[in-house]
Amino acid sequence: MTDVPAVRIRNFCIIAHIDHGKSTLADRLLQATGTVDERQMKEQFLDNMDLERERGITIKLQAARMNYQAKDGQQYVLNLIDTPGHVDFSYEVSRSLAACEGALLVVDASQGVEAQTLANVYLALEHNLEIIPVLNKIDLPGAEPDRVIGEIEEIIGLDCSGAILASAKEGIGISEILEAVVERIPPPPNTVDQRLRALIFDSYYDIYRGVIVYFRVMDGTVKKGDRVYLMASEKEYEIDELGVLSPTQKPVDELHAGEVGYFGAAIKAVADARVGDTITLCNAKAAEALPGYTEANPMVFCGMFPIDADQFEDLREALEKLRLNDAALQYEPETSSAMGFGFRCGFLGLLHMEIVQERLEREYDLDLIITAPSVVYKVITTKGEELYIDNPSHLPAPNDRERIEEPYVKVEMITPETYVGTLMELSQNRRGIFKDMKYLTQGRTTLTYEIPLAEVVTDFFDQMKSRSRGYASMEYHLIGYRENPLVKLDIMINGDPVDSLAMIVHRDKAYGVGRSMAEKLKELIPRHQFKVPIQASIGSKVIASEHIPALRKDVLAKCYGGDISRKKKLLQKQAKGKKRMKSVGTVDVPQEAFMAVLRLDQS
């Protein structure tokens, strides 16, 4: 690899809402610069997880180095850092933005600006990135570039005089994009002579080489064989492999300020090479770490239990391996009276939870029971202590707590005018507080609500999509905790509380939720040899109950006529057996029952 001066390096990323054609555009850029052989080219080249291809979304961050001969005759190195577009992964976006000097803002010319685009653009502006607007999909019959340019200027306030019209699918406008990257995105500052500081923006676990770290050199130079020090985890390593990603890994001997690459150093766990950490040299440590890193905090929690108790160790190993690749996944062991041993896991949001669950089942062959998601509540005890509780069964007794506070999020929805009414109704049903409503261009509106996170994590997104026929988009971020009259709703099956079905709900909604839970469980739990009562209770007060009738064998089938006392004797014997069975028998609760909590109809 030839050494390219920092002046001819460009580090950029692509910001786009889900489905606006970001991965396809990345493919075209790789092809146009000859980085990937035509023979090896496949769609969504940078999305290398099967799950990403299937869902058509980007989850893990990828990076690619492209060599580009610009029109001015100079050879440039373009480092493309791909970013995910989904709201759950905004922490991954902020990491990749910190490694760039510029961004391509890709907007679908037929759909216009969506909520997520907006959120990511604000992140990019916070990092002072140069933003180049690109209108994608202009080959579609419904494309309205002029309207969308107006939207970008009005909503985001970006000057769109230099906006590029493109179609990644047809390959239109690709050379213009590459030229714009060279001309408009500033080169990284030339700080080769300073002490080494490099930012880790991703890492993944390789079973042969240990953790492979993707990083961007901010200052100084790093060489193969250097002993490096990671400032946040306070660990030392020797670099035994160093290289660049183009997009497959190519070894090099050294990387200078402004370059993006990877290294391997026999690191055992990703927790030791945290994303956002600063790399510096052991013998010439930098004075301070790079700014702008925040720990990704999980917002949604749920219990994961193996259906087969023998798989507990396998689940632990699988979670450890996923954790190697996923800095935001948290877990701790948990025991449940109904389901035995499992883990309490923390996620960034619902999509993150689904993806982790799907990867556990698909890549590690596990059969899991997942409990309903819950959020982190803040409990102020009578002694004035603050407790953070992510599991309803850990809630202190009513006389030990003064108040419960729940997290609120600010939800911004962008929707066509037609659906404003139904989305307002949805938000109000979810205890939302109306904050703002703005009319954008031609029949599009933004709605701003403050809604408890617990109401958003279950199925708010699905409901919003179905009510707006898929046209609305949303984005949310945490705004803090507020006090509400919340109660713990216990579900008892056959007289025993099932801790995995317990939840914390608003007092006004408790009766409705308890009622529908009991009805749903009655449908889903199979009939047993004895009568099974299902009760929903708050404290010791039962607020809803249902019964699953017993299956009974016809013990009188063999009596033809004959004495009534003989029949009575048989019936009494059966009743006695049922009674004994009721006291010792266990009720089998299927996985669907736990999932039912997710799909309670509360829209």
Curated annotation (Swiss-Prot):
InterPro entries in the cross-refs = EF-4, EFG_III/V, EFG_V-like, EFTu-like_2, G_TR_CS, GUFP, LepA_C_sf, LepA_CTD
Residues of the tr-type G domain: 7-189
> Which pairs of positions does the record mark as disulfide bonds?
none
Q: Does the keyword Nucleotide-binding apply?
A: yes
Q: Which GO terms describe its biological process?
A: positive regulation of translation; translation
Subcellular compartments: Cell inner membrane
Q: Report membrane topology.
A: Peripheral membrane protein
**EC class:** hydrolase
EC number annotated for this UniProt entry: 3.6.5.n1
Q: One GO CC annotation, please?
A: plasma membrane
The keyword Nucleotide-binding appears for this protein: yes
The family database entries (Gene3D superfamilies) matched by this protein are listed as: 3.30.70.240, Elongation factor 4, C-terminal domain (3.30.70.2570), Elongation Factor G (Translational Gtpase), domain 3 (3.30.70.870), P-loop containing nucleotide triphosphate hydrolases (3.40.50.300), Translation factors (2.40.30.10)
Any one Gene Ontology MF annotation carried by this entry is: GTP binding
Q: Which domain of life is it from?
A: Bacteria
Q: Spell out the reaction equation it catalyses.
A: GTP + H2O = GDP + phosphate + H(+)
Q: Which HAMAP family match?
A: GUFP, LepA
Give the record's family classification: Belongs to the TRAFAC class translation factor GTPase superfamily. Classic translation factor GTPase family. LepA subfamily.
User: What does it do?
Assistant: Required for accurate and efficient protein synthesis under certain stress conditions. May act as a fidelity factor of the translation reaction, by catalyzing a one-codon backward translocation of tRNAs on improperly translocated ribosomes. Back-translocation proceeds from a post-translocation (POST) complex to a pre-translocation (PRE) complex, thus giving elongation factor G a second chance to translocate the tRNAs correctly. Binds to ribosomes in a GTP-dependent manner.
Q: Which NCBIfam families does the record cross-reference, listed alphabetically?
A: lepA, small_GTP
Q: What is this protein called?
A: Elongation factor 4
